[in-house]
């Protein structure tokens, strides 16, 4: 049985909410891509520059299976008003770490762009 977690505006921890910034989505997309490449245990599986979606795999550990992570940047073209959404899904393993996987991306991403 798998698990999942995605950023949600109702979360009390701001790092678990979608990130809204007055930045162009292309800049956030590039910053997100660079961060994924810098994170150990993360692999960038694909980057759809038109849809502004990164598909990643976060390697699992001894008890947790690998997580499939989608990072989606939305916002209007040419206007600095963007939102970053992150979703993690795990299909196997004894432990479900999806919330921790989202935090593993969002905490350094906040430092990088805020």
State what each model feature region is.
Residues 1-114:
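Ser/Thr-rich, low-complexity intrinsically disordered terminal regions
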């Amino acid at each position: 049985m798998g698990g999942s977690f995605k950023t949600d505006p109702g979360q009390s921890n701001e790092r678990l909410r979608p990130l809204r910034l007055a930045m162009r989505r292309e800049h956030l997309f590039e910053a997100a891509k660079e961060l994924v490449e810098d994170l150990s245990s993360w692999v960038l599986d694909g980057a759809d520059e038109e849809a502004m979606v990164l598909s990643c795999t976060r390697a699992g550990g001894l008890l947790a299976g690998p997580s499939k992570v989608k990072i989606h940047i939305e916002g209007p073209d040419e206007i600095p008003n963007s939102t970053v959404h992150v979703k993690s899904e795990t299909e196997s393993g004894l432990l479900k770490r999806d919330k921790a996987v989202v935090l593993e991306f969002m905490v350094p991403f906040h430092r990088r762009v805020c």
